[in-house]
């Protein structure tokens, strides 16, 4: 597993970020989407 930083915009227009462990960028995005109900868009997923 790798560590990914996911930056996203919430439905209220605020920017936020969170990291998680995942096997791929798409898996990291899915994990963050499951944890945050208020995501409007994913802005960046990068391995850290």
What does each model-found stretch correspond to?
Residues 13-23:
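A short, exposed loop/beta-hairpin motif centered on an aromatic-Gly-Thr core
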Residues 34-48:
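Short, mixed-charge low-complexity intrinsically disordered segments
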Residues 13, 32-35:
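Preference for short coil/turn "hinge" residues that link or interrupt alpha-helices
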Residues 1-15:
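Short aromatic-glycine-(Arg/Gly/Cys) micro-motifs in beta-strand/loop hairpins
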């Amino acid at each position: 597993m790798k560590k990914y930083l996911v930056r996203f915009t919430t439905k209220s227009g605020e920017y936020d970020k969170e990291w998680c462990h995942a096997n791929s960028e798409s898996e990291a995005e899915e994990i963050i989407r499951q944890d945050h109900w208020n995501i409007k868009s994913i802005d960046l997923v990068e391995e850290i």
